[in-house]
A protein has these predicted regions:
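Structural signature of tandem-repeat unit edges
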Residues: 1-7, 17-32, 42-57, 67-82, ...
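Consensus positions within tandem repeat domains that build extended binding/scaffold surfaces
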Residues: 9-14, 34-39, 59-64, 84-89, ...
């Protein structure tokens, strides 16, 4: 994509299931990716948005059921404020999500990474504005591997974890929350069989 691109509108590439690669390396002015923009692009394998330094929002269902997508990199997206509902739901091959240095990110909407059954790594370092993890955001991520690096303690602004946000997920090890947490929703961590301790 060229540097001048500012918006990818809804359903722009929806259903392009032979699309295997998207080059965002020059898209430094891109501000938004719309609803269902890359919906069911099942051939897509890697998504590197780290050069998209102007990106503010990703719409609902934007990358829904991109079933061969393995890695998502948001590490340079310092202006990103929200990732919409169902944006990456059913990305069943997704293993790593890098949200490090997304310092403006406030909300992970409902079911955003739900049913990503191979998810093993979510990088959150620098997500200092994240206040809400929505309903079902990471539920049903029951991979054979363990999601052991999800560090709640560095989410210093986090207040609300929604209903079923991590139910039946691969969260593992010790869970420690920062002092600002005020609400854990119904069934927020139900079925997390590999959690060994919780520290409030």
């Amino acid at each position: 994509f060229p540097k001048a691109l500012e918006m990818i509108d809804q359903e722009a590439f929806s259903g392009c299931n032979t699309l295997t690669e998207i080059d965002f390396s020059k898209a430094t002015q891109l501000r938004s990716i719309g609803h269902r923009a890359f919906y069911e692009c099942s051939g897509l394998r890697d998504l590197d948005l780290s050069a998209c330094t102007s990106l503010v929002g990703i719409g609902s269902n934007a990358f829904y059921r991109c079933s061969n997508l393995q890695a998502v990199n948001f590490s340079g997206c310092g202006k990103l404020t929200s990732i919409g509902s169902y944006a990456f739901q059913y990305c069943s091959s997704l293993r790593t999500v890098d949200l490090s240095n997304c310092s403006a990110l406030v909300t992970l909407e409902s079911y955003v990474f739900s049913d990503c059954s191979n998810l093993t790594s979510v990088g959150l370092a620098g997500c200092t504005a994240l206040t809400t993890i929505g309903e079902g955001a990471f539920n049903n991520n029951y991979s054979s591997s363990q999601l052991s690096d999800f560090d709640f303690s560095q989410l210093t602004a986090l207040k609300d974890i929604g209903e079923s946000a991590f139910s039946n997920s691969a969260l593992a090890g010790d869970i420690a929350f920062a002092s600002g947490i005020t609400q854990l929703g119904r069934n927020a961590f139900s079925g997390c069989r590999n959690i060994t301790s919780v520290d409030f």
